[in-house]
Amino acid sequence: MTSGQSTSTPRRRRGALLPTLIILVLAIIAFVFFANVYTEVLWFNQLGFGGIFWQQNISKAIIFVAAFLVMSIAVYFSIRIAYRARPVYAPDSQVQDNLNHYQAQLEPVRKVVMIGVPIVFGVFAGAAALGQWQKVLLFLFQVPFGQTDPQFGMDISFYTNTLPFFGFLSGFLIAVVLISGIAALLTHYLYGAIRLQERGIFTSRAARVQLAVMAALFLIILGVNFFLDRFATLQNNGALRSGAMYTDVNAVIPTKAILAVAAGIVAILFIVAAVVGRWRLPVIGAAMLIITSIVAGGIYPWVIQQFQVGPSEASVEKPYIQRNIDMTRSAYGINDVEVIPYKASTTATPGALRQDATTTANIRLLDPNLMSQTFGQLEQYRPYYGFQKTLNVDRYTVDGKSQDTVIALRELNSGGIPAEQQTWYNKKLVYTHGYGVVAAYGNTATADGKPVFMQSGVPTNGKLGDDNSYQPRIYFGQSTTDYSIVGAGEGTASVELDRPQGGDNSSDSKNTFSGNGGPDVGNWFNRLAYSIKFQSTDLLLSDGVNSKSQILYDRTPVQRVQKVAPYLTIDGNPYPAIVDGKVKWIVDGYTTSNAYPYSQQQPLDSATSDSLTQRSGSGALAGSINYIRNSVKATVDAFDGSVNLYAWDDKDPILKTWQNIFPATIKPISEMSGALLSHIRYPEDLFKVQRELLGRYHVTNATEFYNNTNAWSVPNDPTTGDNTKQPPYYMSLQMPGQNAPAFSLTSNLIPQQVGANTRNVLYGYLAADADAGSTQGVKSDSYGKLRLLSLPTDTQVPGPGQVFNKFVSDPSVSSSLNLLKQGQSQVVNGNLLTLPVGDGLLYVQPVYVQSSTGGSSYPTLQKVLVAFGDKIAFAATLSAALDQLFGGDSGAVTGDKDKPTTPGTGGTGGNTGTPGENPDAKAALAKSLQDANQAIKDGQDALSKGDFTAYGTAQKKLNDAITAALAAEGKLDVTAPGSTGAPTGSAPPSTPPTAGSSTGSPTP
C-alpha cells in the first residue's frame, strides 16, 4: 500500500464520522421531541380530550407555517430582487474595485445566505406568531356580545376578538416590511445599487423603485394602525378611570384619523417618487407626517387637557366617567349588585339575636386556615399521609339540616415516606395514593377544644358515608405532584400500599388500582417514550411495570383542568366534595379579557392576594384583566382523574367562542347532578376581584366618583400582624332581603386608605349567595346574587382592625390570655368573622392554644371572643360569650351551646368592671397561679440539669395548675353586679404580653 493511500483512509473516516455524529444527535433530538409529543397524545386521548390536543396544536402549526412563509418569502424575494437588479460596472472601474473585496468574501456562501437568512427570520416570525394562537382563533370563531360601546357603537366583540387580532397582524406585517426593506437595502448597497458620493447618495432606478414600494407598504400599514388606534383609545387605562375621556374623544381620536389619511398620502408620494425618480416630495411628506404626529398626537391633546379640561374637569369629564362606571360594572358582573342601606345598631340589648337564631346556629368556630395541624395529629394515621395547609369550607345535609363543614382529603405525602424506603420502586409503585375524607362540624368543638368529626377514620366512616358508599382512595389531589405506576393483571399480587388495618394499626393492606386513570405503559414502546419523558431508566427496566400498568401524572386538579381547557384562568382554590358515590375536586374556571372598552384594568395578583394565599403558599392569579366571568365549573375525580367541564355561564360570548373552537368538550349544566350542584360555591378569586372593584365602583354617580370621597378598600387581616388583606369567608347567614339563611361568601369594606393612615370603621359589608341549589340541571335563581350593606357614615361601626385592637387591649381579655400563655404555650388567633345579626354587626373570633414546642403540637379551641358595637365579651363557648355580650340572654342558638366546658370569663369592652366577690375562687386562682409559676421554675431547673424525668413531672404539674386556674377563673363574675365602668375606648389599655404569643398560624 502506498503512503498516499494510507493517509487518505483516516481522512475519509474522519470526514464520514462528523456527518454521522450530526445525524445521530439530530435523530436523538427528534426522538426526544417525538416522545414528548407522543406521550401528550396518549394523555389527552386517555382523558377523552384528544380533540383539544389536535385542534390546539394543528392551529399552532398552521399559524407557525403561515407566519414562517410570509416572513421568509418576503425576505427571500426582497433579497433576490435586489440581487438580480444589481448594476454592472466596468471591470476596472473604481466602484467595482471597492465592491470586489466584499463580494468576493460573500460569493462562496451567497446562495446559502440568500436561502438561510429568510429561513432564520421565518423561524423567529413563526415562533413569535405561535404565541398568538388564541387571538387568531378568537377572531375566526367570535360570537357577538349583543352590546355596543358608547363611542363608536361597535359590538364589544370587536374590541375583545377583532381588534387584538388586527393589532397582532399589523405589528407582524410592519416587522415583515421592515426586515424585508433592510435586507433589500443591504443587498443594494453591497452590489453598488446604492452608494455614497460627494454630491449625495446615488441610487439605481431598480433600488429606488423597490425601496419606494417598501416604504409605501410600511406607510399604508402604519396608516391602518393609526386608524385602529382610534378604537384602542377606549381601552386606555388610567389610575382612577379607564377609557376615552374628553381629550381622547375630542382631540386624540380625530388626530388618529388625520394621521391615517396623512400616512396614506405620503405612501402615494413614495410611489410617485419611484416613477419620477425624485425623493424630495416623499421626504418632505415623511417629515411632515412626523411633525404632525408630534403636534397633533402630543402637543394638541396636551393643550386641550390643560386649558379646556383642567379648569372644569369634573363637569367636562362627567359623561365619560359615567361610561367608565357603567362599562366596568358590566364587565365585572357587579352591575346588578343590590345595595341595601343598613343603619347598624351598636347597642347590645338582651334577646337581640333571637330573630337570627338560624344564622347563629351555624357560626363557624373552626378556622380552616389553622386546622391542618389538628387534622394531621388526630387523623393522619401514617406519616405518608397528609393534609393541605389550608382546609376547605363546604356544607352537607346532616340529620336533615344544612351544616357548615370543614373538610379535607387524607392525601399522599411523599415527604413522609421513611428515608430508608425512598427507592424508585416504593415511590412510584407502592406509595401511590391517599385514603379517605375527613370532615368536622364547623360550629362546635369537644370539651378540650378538638374538632367534632362527622367523617373520620381509616376505614372511613361517619355521617357522610363509609368505604361502601363512596370511593375513598385519593390518587389525584393537590399534593400528588409526582407520577405513579399503577394497575396489574388478574392474579397478580397487589403492591400498592392501601391503608392501615387492624386494631393496633400495626399493618397495612395492599391494593391494585382498578380504574382507568392514565395512559397505558404495558408495551415497550410506550415505556420507552415515558422513560425519555421522565428521564428514568427504572421505568423502562423495572419488572414492577407489567402489561396492565398505567402511568398517572399531571395529577393536581388545577393541572388537569388547565391542560384540557387552556383558554381558562383557573381559580386558585379547588375543593373536594363527596358527590354521587365519588370524591371529586370542584374547580372554577374563568373566561377573561383585557380589551373590554371603558372598563377598568385590574391586576389579578393584587386583587387575589391576601393573608390566606400568603399563609398557604398558594399563588395568587397572574395577569391583568378588565372582564371576567365564572363561565365553567369543572370536576376532577380524585380516584381516576377524569375531568368534566360544565358551561356554568352559557350566556358568556367568550365561552361560546371557545365552544365553537373546541366543540363537544363542555357539557351543558343540565348534566350536572343535584348532588354536585349542592356543593357548588361562589368562587373565591372572582369574589376577591369583585370586592376590589366595588370599593370604588359601588358609587354610580359620576360626580361623586370623580371626587373619590366615598371610596372603600378591603381591610388588612388583623390576626396576621402584617399588611395582607383579610380573606373572604364562607359561612351560612341570612342577609337583609333574604327569606332564609344561605351559604354565602362575605367580606368587609372600610374607608380607602389615604397615605399611611386610614379609619378602620366599617362602611360596607358584601355577601355573595353561594348556594346553587340541589335540583339536577337547574341553577338556583339566587345563586351569585351580590348584596352590599351600605352603612351610614355617621354610624361608627368598628372595623375588624378596631375590634381586634379592643380584644388584645382589654384588661380582662389580656389577663385571661396571659393565663393561657403559661408555660410553653402560645395563643393563636382564629379568623375574625363578621355577621349582620341583631340589626347590627357581630364579630366572632375563636382563640386557640397550642404548645410552642414539639413537632406534634396542634391548636385547640379554648375561648371565643365576640364584639357588638363597642362591647366585647370572652368565654369558653360562643353561647356563653354571646349571653355575656347581650346582657345575660342573647337569644341565640349556637352549635356549642351544649358543649361541656369549664365556665369561661368574659370581658365587657364597653363596660369594663371589676371581678365580682368570690373569696374561695379568688384564693383558688391565686394558689393555682402560684403552683403554675413554681412548676415553670422546676421545669427550667430540670432542663438545666438534663433531668428529663423531672422535667416531665414539672410539665404535668403545670398542666394541672392551668386546669385548676381556668376552673377558678370561671367562677368569678367578669362584671360585678351594678358596675358600669368606663368605655373601652377611654379605659387605659394594658400592654398585651408578647412572649410565647402569636397573632397568626404558628410555625412548629
UniProtKB/Swiss-Prot annotation:
UniProt biased composition (Polar residues): 503-514
Q: Which UniProt keywords apply?
A: Cell membrane, Membrane, Transmembrane, Transmembrane helix
> What are the boundaries of the region Disordered?
494-517, 891-921, 974-1004
- Tree of life domain: Bacteria
Bias (Low complexity) ranges: 975-1004
Q: Which Pfam families match?
A: UPF0182
Protein localization? Cell membrane
In the bilayer, the protein is annotated as:
Multi-pass membrane protein
Task: Assign the protein's first listed, main location to one coarse class.
Answer: membrane
Could you list the residue ranges that cross the membrane? 15-35, 61-81, 112-132, 165-185, 209-229, 257-277, 284-304
Feature: compositional bias, Gly residues: 904-913
Q: Does the keyword Cell membrane apply?
A: yes
One of the record's GO cellular component terms: extracellular region
**HAMAP family reported in the protein's UniProt record:** UPF0182
The family note in this entry says:
Belongs to the UPF0182 family.
Protein name, as recorded: UPF0182 protein RSal33209_1243
Protein's organism = Renibacterium salmoninarum (strain ATCC 33209 / DSM 20767 / JCM 11484 / NBRC 15589 / NCIMB 2235)
